[in-house]
């Protein structure tokens, strides 16, 4: 037993030793990778990067940047790369002692140092590329500025007439660019690449602005010297022609406004000559806005005249229509009020319409007199005609509505008479059906309903004979009588149908009297109720008796009665 225990312990020890050696082998591979990485980063071309800067002009800012980067290289090597060798050596020693965690910490530290070293290299590479790119950008901007300088100078010289009095100032501004180009060369020669970049970039923007001025100035001069004066002249003579045609354009104030605009225009060219183009554009925009306002007023007058010519005849027709309709209404009201009740407010409205129409006609006459003058402000005439048109339209609508009301009075009377005749005819027809039916007697309530209808009809007939007739009240009463008649007819139909149905049920049930005493008893009760005009109750008892001996038969009998 002891032997087995000893063997087990030995096996466990061997396994543990094997695991330790396996782990050390894995850790050894990590250390080897760190060594390989160290060898790789030692070859990073720090010096080659700096060599690119040495090809530039190592003065001023460039020299300062070069020295700083060179110093950073030394510091990076001493701070990040030099300690790596020691860290790796420590890791190997600890690994030999099977101190895995401590060895791993040393390797991690070594990797962090190498990361920092690589970052330092990457930062140096970016800085070098940035400096080289800035040098290249500076040279490109410089070449462009030189070309622009020559072209701008040539353009002013060749097209001096297009720039007017601004040509001299343009030449002066262009000449200022030459010493600034030379200043760039000095900054570049001194190695001050950042100052050189800021200088040439600012110069390029100023050249762009002056170039835009050179493109804009000929357009501004053309507008100032030709286009606007031409528009002033066209507007002046155009208004003169319109006045000859009869237009009143005093409110446009053409002469005074044009004189004011000419004065304002005279300040534009000096602004252009001083290259104050923003102020010049503002003044031109203001002049154009005022011109547009004048054109709008004139165009409004022309359109107003066309509108006046189109609407004048329409308004004339509407006024005559209103006057004729008013006369017709006055005559018709006097005739109609003898036969029909008419609200006094309607008669007053007609008289009021007469006064309003006469007032509108007077206004229209004044407008026509105004239009006969040698100078007419058609916009005012248009507004006045619109006022007339709106009011006469309202009057015509109201008069037509009143006229339709008078016509409707006759139609309503005829309709009421026709409805009353139909009520009388229908009432007699329904009552005859009640008398000719199988009813033992006409129920008293139908006699009462018939008498009430007769009374209402006589009352309405008496009102028809009276004058003047209040048509609305009469029509309402006839409508109530029609409702009474419909109720009378509906209830009579129900009673007639129920009486036939009850009789059919009793007749059908006679076959069961001998065999079923309870059926015989129920049918006797149904006959008694039938004789007393209680048809619905008779139906209920007869249906119950028949369903007890022959289920479903009552539905069949009811369908036959409905078909009849």
From Swiss-Prot:
Family from the record: Belongs to the EzrA family.
Keyword Cell division in annotation: yes
Record function comment: Negative regulator of FtsZ ring formation; modulates the frequency and position of FtsZ ring formation. Inhibits FtsZ ring formation at polar sites. Interacts either with FtsZ or with one of its binding partners to promote depolymerization.
Topological domains, Extracellular: 1-4
Classification via InterPro entries: EzrA
Compartments it resides in: Cell membrane
Transmembrane segments: 5-23
Record topological domains on the Cytoplasmic side: 24-564
Any one biological process term the GO annotation gives: division septum assembly
Protein name: Septation ring formation regulator EzrA
Chief location category: membrane
Organism of this sequence: Staphylococcus aureus (strain MRSA252)
GO (cellular component) term, any one: septin ring
Topological relation to the membrane, as annotated: Single-pass membrane protein
């Amino acid at each position: 037993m002891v032997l087995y225990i000893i063997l087990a312990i030995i096996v466990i020890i061997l396994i543990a030793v094997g695991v330790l050696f396996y782990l050390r082998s894995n850790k050894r591979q990590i250390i080897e990778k760190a060594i390989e990485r160290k060898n790789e980063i030692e070859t990073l071309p720090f010096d080659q990067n700096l060599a690119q800067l040495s090809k530039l002009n190592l003065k001023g800012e460039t020299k300062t940047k070069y020295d700083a980067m060179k110093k950073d290289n030394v510091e990076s090597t001493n701070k990040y790369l030099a300690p790596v060798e020691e860290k790796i050596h420590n890791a190997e020693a600890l690994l030999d002692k099977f101190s895995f965690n401590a060895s791993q910490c040393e390797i991690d530290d070594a990797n962090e140092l190498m990361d920092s070293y690589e970052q330092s290299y990457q930062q140096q590479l970016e800085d070098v590329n940035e400096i080289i790119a800035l040098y290249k950008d500076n040279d490109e901007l410089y070449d462009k500025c030189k070309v622009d300088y020559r072209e701008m100078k040539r353009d002013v010289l060749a097209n001096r007439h297009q720039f007017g009095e601004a040509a001299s100032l343009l030449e002066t501004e262009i000449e200022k660019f030459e010493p600034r180009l030379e200043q760039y060369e000095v900054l570049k020669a001194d190695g001050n690449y950042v100052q050189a970049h800021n200088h040439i970039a600012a110069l390029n923007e100023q050249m762009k602005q002056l170039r835009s001025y050179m493109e804009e100035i000929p357009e501004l001069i053309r507008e100032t010297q030709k286009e606007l004066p031409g528009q002033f002249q066209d507007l002046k003579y155009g208004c003169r022609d319109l006045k000859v045609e009869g237009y009143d354009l005093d409110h446009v104030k053409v002469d005074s406004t044009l004189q004011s605009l000419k004065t304002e225009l005279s300040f534009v060219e000096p602004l252009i000559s001083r290259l104050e183009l923003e102020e010049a554009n503002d003044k031109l925009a203001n002049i154009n806005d005022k011109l547009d306002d004048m054109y709008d007023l004139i165009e409004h007058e022309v359109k107003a005249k066309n509108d006046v010519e189109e609407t004048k005849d329409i308004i004339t027709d509407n006024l005559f229509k209103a006057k004729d309709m008013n006369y017709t209404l006055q005559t018709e009201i006097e005739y109609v009020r003898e036969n029909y009740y008419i609200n006094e407010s309607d008669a007053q409205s007609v008289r009021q319409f007469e006064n309003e129409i006469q007032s509108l006609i007077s206004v229209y006459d004044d407008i026509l007199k105004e239009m006969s003058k040698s100078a007419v402000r058609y916009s005012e005439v248009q507004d006045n005609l619109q006022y007339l048109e709106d009011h006469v339209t309202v009057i015509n609508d109201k008069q037509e509505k009143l006229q339709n009301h008078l016509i409707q009075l006759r139609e309503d009377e005829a309709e009421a008479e026709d409805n009353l005749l139909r009520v009388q005819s229908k009432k007699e027809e329904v009552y005859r059906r009640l008398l000719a039916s199988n009813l033992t007697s006409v129920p008293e309530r139908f006699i009462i309903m018939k008498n009430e209808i007769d009374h209402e009809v006589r009352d309405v007939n008496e009102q028809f004979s009276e004058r003047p007739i209040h048509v609305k009240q009469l029509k309402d009463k006839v409508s109530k009588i029609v409702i009474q008649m419909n109720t009378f007819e509906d209830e009579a139909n129900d009673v007639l149908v129920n009486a036939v149905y009850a009789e059919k049920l009793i007749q059908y049930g006679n076959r069961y009297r001998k065999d079923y005493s309870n059926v015989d008893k129920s049918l006797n009760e149904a006959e008694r109720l039938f004789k007393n005009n209680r048809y619905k109750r008779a139906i209920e008892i007869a249906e119950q008796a028949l369903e007890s001996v022959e289920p479903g038969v009552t539905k069949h009998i009811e369908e036959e009665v409905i078909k009849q």
